[in-house]
């Protein structure tokens, strides 16, 4: 619990006490929403015209036809006024991490207990490719879960990496389980490197895989103890 002030019931007037309570309530509400959401609420309620994408201009374009008005009534003006692009200066920028966007990224990093957090609007697939393009160079050996998402396969192709696959288990129901611990042994990985036709003539003992990618969790909900 935190103490922010006192109310002197027998000294202050009811009007003053009411203003005091309203001030504290407003302070609570102002700090309740995370940074970007608060900026989005403020922008949508500001009454500014929309001269940027999307082309419905804050929902106005939908009001020009009967079916458009049905659409507008179904979703509501509030949502359509808040449907904006990254050209709105008041909301900050995803590309250079400024303004409320940057504040929200810092807030998310704090919540996740991470050093940094960057928002991506193209989903996990694009996030995976970004990590790989930053980390992996053509010809690098990478160790990858054979039950990986297709974005990892795309990353292998795009970066020119040489994959060494770890084979997961599968039960009699066809459900793919975790990768056996034996697959992670150095000797097992070196054996896979020696057997890889794309690495013919390479000294397996000298190879240092550039990245390890696991599917966490699997599509059937299997979780690894990554510690």
Residue ranges and their predicted role:
Residues 98-101, 122-127, 148-151, 217-222:
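Gly/Ser/Thr-rich loops at beta-strand to alpha-helix junctions
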Residues 116-144, 150-155:
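Conserved beta-loop-alpha segment that forms the PLP phosphate-binding cup at the N-terminus of a helix
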Residues 174-227:
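Active-site phosphate-binding strand-loop segment of PLP-dependent enzymes
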């Amino acid at each position: 619990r935190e103490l922010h002030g006192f109310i002197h019931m027998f000294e202050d007037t009811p009007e003053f006490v009411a203003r005091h309570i309203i001030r504290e309530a407003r302070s609570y509400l102002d700090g309740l929403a995370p940074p970007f959401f608060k900026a989005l609420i403020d922008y949508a309620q500001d009454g500014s015209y929309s001269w940027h994408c999307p082309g419905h201009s804050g929902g106005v374009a939908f009001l020009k036809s009967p079916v458009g008005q049905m659409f507008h009534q179904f979703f509501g003006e509030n949502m359509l006024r808040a449907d904006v692009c990254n050209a709105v200066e008041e909301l900050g920028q995803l590309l250079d991490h400024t303004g409320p966007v940057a504040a929200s990224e810092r807030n998310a990093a704090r919540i996740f207990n991470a050093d940094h957090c960057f928002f991506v609007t193209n989903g996990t697939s694009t996030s995976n490719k970004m990590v790989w393009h930053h980390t992996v160079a053509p010809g690098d050996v990478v160790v990858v879960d054979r039950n990986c998402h297709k974005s990892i396969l795309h990353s292998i192709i795009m970066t020119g990496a040489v994959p060494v696959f770890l084979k997961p288990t599968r039960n009699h129901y066809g459900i793919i389980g975790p990768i056996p611990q034996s697959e992670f042994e150095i000797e097992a990985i070196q054996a896979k490197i020696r057997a890889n036709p794309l690495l013919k003539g390479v000294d397996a003992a000298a190879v240092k895989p550039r990245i390890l990618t696991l599917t966490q969790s699997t599509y059937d909900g299997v979780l690894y103890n990554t510690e």
